[in-house]
Amino acid sequence: MRVHVADHPLITHKLTALRDRTTPSPVFRSLADELVTLLAYEATRDVRVETITVQTPVAPAEGLTLSDPKPLVVPILRAGLGMLDGLMRLMPSAEVGFLGMVRNEETLQPDIYAERLPTDLSNRQCFVVDPMLATGGSLIAAIEYLFDRGAVDVTCICLIAAPEGLKAVEEATAGREVTIVLGALDERLDEVGYIIPGLGDAGDRLYGTAAH
């Protein structure tokens, strides 16, 4: 498994505002959208392309286009939905699938409540977006689900992560083509599985359903 932790002042600046408990939901959504676009540059470094020739107003020019089958972007609902537009802005021709998961607060394990994905993902590159990698349960389940359907490699974009969750994903995906791109790697998980210092509940803060 490959891990890339962003090292850029603009990303740190936006993450700082995202963490601030006084940041209102509309601003939080805007920051999450901007952050995933910045992180997507690294996440798409190995996106599959093929050479084409186009005609400029002056002469032919050789360039690149995304290969078929097009990449599949998979937000983990509900919080991952807030990151979808930021990635699709860079890859508008990508397809989108949805995976609905909720963390069981007693077991800290994910429960799948919705799925809308192509049945056959053979030869597909998949990009999973989820704001937080905490225990790793949801991400592990999503990655396994995609590989079971034939995906060839999976790249996950998360705004923040805990070391415990990152280690769990690495152990669970050993031997798989998995890349994790992070805005920041935080200190630890607390006793109930929240990232410290973290940013609270990303879904609640994105959609204004609670204050943390």
Swiss-Prot record:
Record text on cofactor binding: Binds 1 Mg(2+) ion per subunit. The magnesium is bound as Mg-PRPP.
Enzyme class: transferase
Lineage top rank: taxon: Bacteria
Residues annotated as binding uracil: 195, 200-202
Activity modulation: Allosterically activated by GTP.
Pfam families recorded: UPRTase (PF14681)
UniProt GO molecular function: GTP binding; magnesium ion binding; uracil phosphoribosyltransferase activity
Keywords, comma-separated and alphabetical: Allosteric enzyme, Glycosyltransferase, GTP-binding, Magnesium, Nucleotide-binding, Transferase
EC number, as in UniProt: 2.4.2.9
One of the protein's GO biological processes: UMP salvage
SUPFAM superfamilies: PRTase-like
Transmembrane segments: none
Coiled-coil segments: none
Reaction(s) the record says it catalyses: UMP + diphosphate = 5-phospho-alpha-D-ribose 1-diphosphate + uracil
Pathway(s) of this molecule: Pyrimidine metabolism; UMP biosynthesis via salvage pathway; UMP from uracil: step 1/1
Binding site for 5-phospho-alpha-D-ribose 1-diphosphate: 78, 103, 130-138, 201
Cofactor(s) the record lists: Mg(2+)
Family: Belongs to the UPRTase family.
Biological function: Catalyzes the conversion of uracil and 5-phospho-alpha-D-ribose 1-diphosphate (PRPP) to UMP and diphosphate.
HAMAP family xref list: Upp_B
Descriptive protein name: Uracil phosphoribosyltransferase
Source species of the chain: Clavibacter michiganensis subsp. michiganensis (strain NCPPB 382)
